[in-house]
A protein has these predicted regions:
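Histidine-dependent nucleotide/RNA phosphoesterase domain, centered on the 2H-phosphoesterase fold
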Residues: 1-157
């Protein structure tokens, strides 16, 4: 944990789809996301009639900028959700989706050997989590690892 930024306020979460920055106006930038598109995505998700589901947190791993927990989705529910969301908008994120929970951003540039060495020393323990709701959330881009705010929530089941 001494390699991570200390001021992390962001709640632990699993990002499903990066839509962009919410706006009530016609999009001016590539990462603008209209409220009417959000409303369409909500309708599409409600059509899935999702029941609560289980995910499994597995190993700790590292991106170049962050430490994270892998998420195993045995029934590919996250894939179904992402496919549904992609019907009404183009994601503005990395091409390959890796379900994960970010544990923190690195405070500096660290040698990958050092990071991987530390990860390997950690005990492995898989944990299951129950997903009961989906949240369309947002954050203030000017605040590094600032809070997430809920905009709309869908209760499952």
């Amino acid at each position: 944990s001494d390699l991570l930024i200390k001021s992390n306020q962001r709640q632990y979460h699993i990002t499903l789809f990066v839509c962009g920055f919410l706006t009530s106006h016609h999009p001016n930038f590539d990462d603008d996301f209209e409220i009417k598109t959000l409303n369409h995505q909500i309708e599409l998700l409600q059509q899935l009639r999702l029941e609560p589901f289980e995910l499994e947190m597995t190993q700790i791993d590292s991106f170049s900028s962050a430490l994270f927990l892998h998420i195993h989705d045995q029934n590919n529910i996250l894939g179904k959700i992402r496919k549904q969301l992609a019907q009404s908008s183009t994601e503005i994120a990395a091409v390959d989706y890796c379900p994960h929970i970010t544990l923190g951003l690195y405070s500096d540039t660290w040698a990958s050997d050092l990071v991987l060495q530390r990860i390997q020393k950690l005990p492995r323990k898989n944990m299951k989590i129950q997903v009961n709701q989906l949240t369309f959330g947002y954050y203030k881009a000017q605040i590094l690892q600032g809070l997430l705010y809920p905009y709309h929530q869908i209760q499952l089941g």
